[in-house]
């Protein structure tokens, strides 16, 4: 039977044993090579991040030069100034913006309206109560 299998597969049985989970030839330096590969990947990643940070710093320097040249402010600076101006104007001003209505303040009036309507319906005769309840 073995002879027939060897003839049919043409010498591929050695590889078949390995593929099926048989004895594998282990490289004694495999762990060392894997560790070196991982270290090389880490170094490449660090170099890539450093290069990206350097490019971004250069871009920001160019952007800042353009802002200085044309008197443009950063978005964060504009927002901070607008917020400060709004707060300064609203401290003693009569025209300060109205405060938002806290949640739940307008709900009580609606509940009162419903309860008043219910009390009025209670005093109506039976057939009229049925009409209003629908």
Curated annotation (Swiss-Prot):
GO terms for biological process: modulation of chemical synaptic transmission; regulation of synaptic vesicle fusion to presynaptic active zone membrane; synaptic vesicle exocytosis. It comes from the Eukaryota. SUPFAM superfamilies: SNARE fusion complex. Residues 29-69 form a coiled coil. GO terms for cellular component: cytosol; perikaryon; SNARE complex; terminal bouton. Residues 15-81 have a biased composition (Basic and acidic residues). The keyword ATP-binding does not apply. Residues 1-112 are annotated as: Disordered. InterPro entries: Synaphin. The keyword Transport applies. It is found in: Cytoplasm, Cytosol; Perikaryon; Presynapse. One of its GO terms (molecular function) is syntaxin binding. Residues 48-70 are annotated as: Interaction with the SNARE complex. Keywords: Cell projection, Coiled coil, Cytoplasm, Exocytosis, Neurotransmitter transport, Synapse, Transport. Positively regulates a late step in synaptic vesicle exocytosis. Organizes the SNAREs into a cross-linked zigzag topology that, when interposed between the vesicle and plasma membranes, is incompatible with fusion, thereby preventing SNAREs from releasing neurotransmitters until an action potential arrives at the synapse. Also involved in glucose-induced secretion of insulin by pancreatic beta-cells. Belongs to the complexin/synaphin family. Binds to the SNARE core complex containing SNAP25, VAMP2 and STX1A. This is Complexin-1.
């Amino acid at each position: 039977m073995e002879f027939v299998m060897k003839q049919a597969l043409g010498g591929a049985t050695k590889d078949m044993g390995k593929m099926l989970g048989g004895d594998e030839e282990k490289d004694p330096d495999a762990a060392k090579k894997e560790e070196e590969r991982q270290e090389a990947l880490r170094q490449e990643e660090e170099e890539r991040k450093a290069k990206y940070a350097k490019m971004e710093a250069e871009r920001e320097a160019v952007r800042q030069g353009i802002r200085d040249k044309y008197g443009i402010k950063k978005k964060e600076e504009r927002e901070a100034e607008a917020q400060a101006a709004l707060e300064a104007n609203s401290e003693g001003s009569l025209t300060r913006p109205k405060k938002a209505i806290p949640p739940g303040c307008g709900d009580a009036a609606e509940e009162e309206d419903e309860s008043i309507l219910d009390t009025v319906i209670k005093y109506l005769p039976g057939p009229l109560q049925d009409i209003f309840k629908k």
